[in-house]
Amino acid sequence: MHNGSFFLRHSFDHSIDNSGGYDIGILGNSFSGSSEPGIVWVMQDENGNGLPDDTWYELAGSETGKPETIQNYAVTYYRPSEPKQPVKWTDNQGNSGEIDYLQQFHRQEYYYPLWIEADSYTLTGTCLQARNYDASGNGSYWVNVEYAWGYADNFSPIARLT
């Protein structure tokens, strides 16, 4: 499963016991040099209404508690004024930038989600330190290095199920 910077919500008809080991695996399309780590959150339907409206808990991964891991991170994206323009962003750490519009890779005119009516939207969560680098030196081949364990769509030698 490739998530594309969004989220997936799935429910089970039973609880998953915490044995202290690897109790759940969420595989994606990762391979060595191409990890897109997703932080996993879980919730128990305590009120029994079948809705995801109870307390959510972030599962610990190998980067939990490290100084370079930012808890309560927030990034705000801004709607471009015209089609085929970069999406500007700011975060709560004082950083800003833009997501380049790459017409050669995508046919849609906007990266900004069309279903969001507001001119900006903010996402909050945990931010892992980036491990990607340009192996080509010219921006044509990027390597996304894996984390040790505990993330979805992450090629971990420890957390592999096969």
List PLM regions with ranges:
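Beta-strand signatures of extracellular beta-sandwich domains
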Residues: 39-41
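A domain-level signal for the mature, folded cores of soluble proteins
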Residues: 1-36, 55-162
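Short loop/turn segments immediately following beta-strands, especially the blade-tip
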Residues: 43-49
